[in-house]
Amino acid sequence: MPLVTSKEMFAKAYDGGYAIGAFNVNNMEIVQGITEACQEEHAPVILQVSKGARAYANHTYLVKLVEAAVACCPDIPIVLHLDHGPDFETCKSCIDGGFTSVMIDASSKPFAENIEITKKVVEYAHDHGVVVEAELGTLAGIEDEVKVAAHEASYTRPEEVEEFVSKTGCDSLAIAIGTSHGAYKFKPEQCTVNEKGILVPPPLRFDVLKEVSRRLPGFPIVLHGSSSVPQDYVKMINDHGGKMPNAIGVPEEQLRQAARLSVCKINIDSDLRLAMTGTIRQFMDEHPDKFDPREYLKPARANIKELVRHKLVDVLGCAGKA
């Protein structure tokens, strides 16, 4: 099966009450871990590449890695998506370079300018058979080159979504309902403490999501910054020389609730980084004599695979939906 767009994928997800996992990729082991889990669970998947990943690994290397995944996992639909395209030129480069989906993120611009930039990308993308994700509202946090301070973040305004989608022609819309980028999604003072002494973050703004869905019936919604920051991997990192105090993510039950509504794409990046980093730190700490990268990248890949499997089955609900 060749690379596909997300159009049919999202239509099935919307009707079926599940979401597609959009996992950020940076190297071979991450691509392998994700796609092997999806192949075994018969789940559709979006492999997404940020501007930072393209700078790190090179556009051509990443495309070829994804093409290899397509060849090795022929039974599942795979989308190659640009995450947080900052401008028309970056989106055009990815469209011309084999991507089947791009995101134009002009959410920091004034509303009218966001429409103008997004529409330009949509027109070029649709002429080339590529779909476009846009964004309204701004998430706090840090992801590669996307840096937004908490005081600059803003929830999506539901009263703007109909005009935005109508004027831009975008195929899906990322909204801001309380998620944020990175492993430090919430400050301790924003959280409550449960009976086990664990910090519990504030709930997502499902009222905003439901109002957006009411105004855009049948339209696919996207959640960015949706890593749950598994505490076992945070502990693994901290136990083996790392320093990640108060790393807090989005509770998985809230993501499952969002997937049952109109959210068709859920972005996950930090969880993969935590799994890989924790595994490698533990291996290095326990085996100080080892120096073969294959020896520590192999268990890192295996843990990424199991993490993704858990997301597909227990969080996204997309296992068996390929």
Spans of features found by a protein language model:
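Basic/polar N-terminal segments that are highly enriched at the extreme N-terminus
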Residues: 1-3, 322
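Short catalytic/ligand-gating loop segments at beta-alpha or beta-beta junctions
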Residues: 223-228
